[in-house]
């Protein structure tokens, strides 16, 4: 990877918002192959979401280029609360919850980065040992309150108020960078655009305590916005999680495959490891054959495989194809639950029932007359089979372990009927 210019690659991918010292960083990369860089994440939940992928993709690119990524889990800072991007005070979590979240996040990070040339550390290990007098004497005196007040993350909160606890967060994050630089030879911090002030505070602290010539760099990532101006990272159903129990591989795949033509190339550059020429070719396809959605399919494949592996991708594609073709009978019971989790649902008993009665009783049809008309016109499918016989009996035990009957009306209108009793 000696001839690979990672900074130019990051620029091409639209991954750099600000850098503290590009010339110094280039000089360091030219002379050293041991660059270590980090980003932090506080254990505010028990799963990562796709917003976390934004900094993690930068770390992963550096890892693939032979450098050493480090992730700091904020067991210490997480008990305080980062004010960045918030207009109100965070609700503090219990120590038990924080530790549970730390374990869950660690497992997900190892899945993304492996264990080779990658480290996870917890800032509880150094912040938790520091007493108040040490904090004030060794670090507090190096921070000017007027400078801290001018940081955007604090200034934006002054009108509505900010606690001393959250006000001090930037000092704790600066200490993180200093400790990592001093004890773990970490030279660079990356973060979102709103972390610029915290990152530069850490670099200033390193230079004050270790000397101005100590290598310390910072890089921030642009705010990821969709073409419609809204913030990237949410679906209509809320956050898109990396935990397959919270967001199934199928739902995850669907999030990416449904991206707008105006956004898909930007996301291919940022969230995949495809080469420039591959992405350029897909960009041409978007212009000439947008209806094929080849770029979206490739995006969904690459990101789903990265997060959920080949098995997760295969499951997502199997479910997607079954719903698209209408051939749902080969899905497993679990796959049906995943595929139709957000579809309209109804309940019915376990006994066999005439199709027309079944459709009316489950409120899929408003009347028997309408039900007969739709059946006769071939608009009704039971477990993937088109039924045009109004005397047909629905047997709930016939498929999906007797748990479900899938009714499709027309091309795409699915209802998942849960069988009770």
Curated annotation (Swiss-Prot):
Q: Give the reactions, separated by semicolons, that this protein catalyses.
A: tRNA(Tyr) + L-tyrosine + ATP = L-tyrosyl-tRNA(Tyr) + AMP + diphosphate + H(+)
Top-level taxonomic group: Bacteria
Motif 'HIGH' region: residue span? 43-52
Q: Give the binding site residues for ATP.
A: 234
UniProt key word Aminoacyl-tRNA synthetase:
yes
What GO biological process term is on the record, naming one?
A: tyrosyl-tRNA aminoacylation
Q: Which Pfam families match?
A: SYY_C-terminal, tRNA-synt_1b
Extent of motif 'KMSKS' region: 231-235
Q: What do the Gene Ontology cellular component annotations say?
A: cytosol
Give residue ranges for domain S4 RNA-binding: 353-419
Q: Where in the cell is it found?
A: Cytoplasm
Q: What are the protein's GO molecular function terms?
A: ATP binding; RNA binding; tyrosine-tRNA ligase activity
Write out the similarity annotation. Belongs to the class-I aminoacyl-tRNA synthetase family. TyrS type 1 subfamily.
Q: What does this protein do?
A: Catalyzes the attachment of tyrosine to tRNA(Tyr) in a two-step reaction: tyrosine is first activated by ATP to form Tyr-AMP and then transferred to the acceptor end of tRNA(Tyr).
Q: What is this protein called?
A: Tyrosine--tRNA ligase
Write down the species. Answer: Lactobacillus delbrueckii subsp. bulgaricus (strain ATCC 11842 / DSM 20081 / BCRC 10696 / JCM 1002 / NBRC 13953 / NCIMB 11778 / NCTC 12712 / WDCM 00102 / Lb 14)
What lineage, starting at the top, does this entry show? Bacteria, Bacillati, Bacillota, Bacilli, Lactobacillales
What's the encoding gene here?
tyrS
């Amino acid at each position: 990877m000696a001839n690979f210019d990672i900074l130019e690659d990051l620029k091409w991918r639209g991954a750099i918002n600000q850098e503290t010292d590009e010339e110094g960083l280039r000089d360091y990369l030219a002379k050293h192959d041991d660059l270590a860089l980090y980003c932090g994440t506080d254990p505010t939940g028990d799963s990562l979401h796709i917003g976390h992928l934004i900094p993690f993709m930068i770390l992963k690119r550096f890892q693939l280029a032979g450098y050493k990524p480090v992730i700091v889990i904020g067991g210490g800072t997480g008990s305080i609360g980062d004010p960045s991007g918030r207009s109100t005070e965070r609700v503090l979590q219990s120590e038990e919850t924080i530790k549970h979240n730390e374990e869950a996040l660690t497992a997900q990070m190892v899945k993304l980065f492996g264990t080779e040339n990658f480290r996870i550390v917890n800032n509880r290990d150094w912040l938790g040992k520091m007493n108040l007098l040490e904090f004030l004497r060794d670090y507090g005196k190096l921070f000017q309150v007027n400078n801290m007040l001018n940081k955007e993350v604090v200034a934006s909160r002054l009108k509505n108020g900010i606690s001393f606890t959250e006000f001090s967060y930037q000092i704790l994050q600066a200490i993180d960078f200093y400790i990592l630089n001093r004890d773990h030879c970490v030279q660079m911090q990356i973060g979102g655009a709103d972390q610029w002030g915290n990152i530069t505070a850490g670099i200033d602290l390193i230079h004050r305590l270790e000397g101005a010539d100590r290598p310390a760099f910072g890089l921030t990532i642009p705010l990821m916005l969709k073409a419609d101006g809204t913030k990237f990272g949410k679906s209509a159903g809320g956050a898109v999680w990396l935990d397959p129990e919270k967001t199934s591989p199928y739902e995850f795949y669907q999030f990416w495959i449904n991206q707008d033509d105006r956004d898909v190339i930007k996301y291919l550059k940022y969230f995949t490891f495809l080469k420039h020429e591959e992405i350029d070719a897909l960009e041409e396809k978007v212009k000439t054959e947008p209806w094929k959605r080849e770029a979206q399919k490739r995006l969904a494949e690459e990101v789903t495989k990265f997060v959920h592996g080949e098995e997760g991708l295969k499951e997502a594609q199997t479910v997607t194809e079954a719903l698209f073709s209408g051939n749902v009978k080969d899905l497993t019971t679990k796959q049906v639950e995943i595929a139709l989790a957000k579809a309209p649902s109804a309940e019915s008993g376990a006994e066999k029932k005439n199709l027309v009665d079944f459709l009316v009783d489950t409120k899929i049809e408003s009347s028997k007359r309408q039900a007969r008309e739709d059946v006769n016109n071939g608009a009704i499918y039971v477990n993937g089979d088109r039924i045009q016989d109004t005397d047909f009996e629905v047997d709930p035990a016939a498929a999906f372990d007797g748990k479900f009957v899938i009714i499709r009306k027309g091309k795409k209108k699915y209802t998942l009927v849960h069988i009770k009793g």
